[in-house]
């Protein structure tokens, strides 16, 4: 089989009440880790790459690594997603390079630093949706800026993230605006701002409702029951990996991520895609440091890379179980981009809100 549209996976997740972790990839070892975990847990897969990852790996290398996963695991439905596309051009180049899903992040302007107006966000996102849907590709939009409700600041990821401080009105997705945004853009998925941010340093204490607004997801889901919601910046930052890194020479200070139980609450309220990167980075770093410390004379790269696959695979398998993804890959009938282009053309996948239906 070929890669599948992300919409196919999100629809199945919604129908069956589970979420799908979307793991960022940059190299072969990360893809192997994810696919081994998915194979062992019978889980559908969303691989995603940022602009930085595409630049780091190179378009051709990245594309063939992903196709290698498809050929090796033909029984697992896999979507390849562009994370945080900063402009329509970025999204179109991703589709040309084989991505079956793109994120048009119009919450920021094309410089990926300046918070954008609602009108700008709607216009660029709707433009991408029109083009992507014509070829069957899925589109994720974002409303609100990702950042900390504690500090008002965000953490740039591969150069993508606002600068300075924002107030809560910009850091929390407005439910009524979300309805208007979905109706005007027809996105397949909506990333919501609830106080999470990129990187390891998300919260200075275990998050509560004051700094992690899971209740905002519930409000949005009530108005948009048929829209697939997305949580960004949702690594849990497990203490075990931080302890291991620091045991073997690291210096990561105390920090807190998004507790798994909070993500599970989100999944029960319409979250279908959960973005995770930092947890895997921590596991890989722990493996490298441990391997180097225990055998300092070894200079074979495989000595460091093999344990990194093992540890990252552990993280991925845990998330597939915790998000109730496990056991669902074999239940999904794989469809193509052409199949979905036909569905969009016929209006079968038109987004509706509770408000618009009532009218």
Curated annotation (Swiss-Prot):
Residues involved in dihydroxyacetone phosphate binding: 199, 233-235, 275-278
Zinc recorded as keyword: yes
InterPro entries named in the record: Aldolase_TIM, Class_II_FBP_aldolase, FBA_II, Fruct_bisP_Calv
Membrane-spanning ranges: none
Domain of life from the UniProt record: Bacteria
Cofactor(s) named in the record: Zn(2+)
Enzyme class, first EC level, given as a word: lyase
GO MF annotation list: fructose-bisphosphate aldolase activity; zinc ion binding
Binding note for cofactor: Binds 2 Zn(2+) ions per subunit. One is catalytic and the other provides a structural contribution.
Record GO biological process: glycolytic process
Catalytic residues identified in the record: 83
Binding site for Zn(2+) 2: 105, 142
This protein's pathway: Carbohydrate degradation; glycolysis; D-glyceraldehyde 3-phosphate and glycerone phosphate from D-glucose: step 4/4
Annotated catalysed reactions: beta-D-fructose 1,6-bisphosphate = D-glyceraldehyde 3-phosphate + dihydroxyacetone phosphate
EC nos: 4.1.2.13
PROSITE patterns: ALDOLASE_CLASS_II_1 (PS00602), ALDOLASE_CLASS_II_2 (PS00806)
A Pfam family hit: F_bP_aldolase
Residues bound to Zn(2+) 1: 84, 198, 232
Keywords annotated in UniProt: Glycolysis, Lyase, Metal-binding, Zinc
Binding site for D-glyceraldehyde 3-phosphate: 50
Function: Catalyzes the aldol condensation of dihydroxyacetone phosphate (DHAP or glycerone-phosphate) with glyceraldehyde 3-phosphate (G3P) to form fructose 1,6-bisphosphate (FBP) in gluconeogenesis and the reverse reaction in glycolysis.
Sequence similarity: Belongs to the class II fructose-bisphosphate aldolase family.
PANTHER family: D-TAGATOSE-1,6-BISPHOSPHATE ALDOLASE, D-TAGATOSE-1,6-BISPHOSPHATE ALDOLASE SUBUNIT GATY-RELATED
The protein's name in its UniProt record: Fructose-bisphosphate aldolase class 2
Organism: Synechocystis sp. (strain ATCC 27184 / PCC 6803 / Kazusa)
Phylogenetic classification of the source organism: Bacteria, Bacillati, Cyanobacteriota, Cyanophyceae, Synechococcales
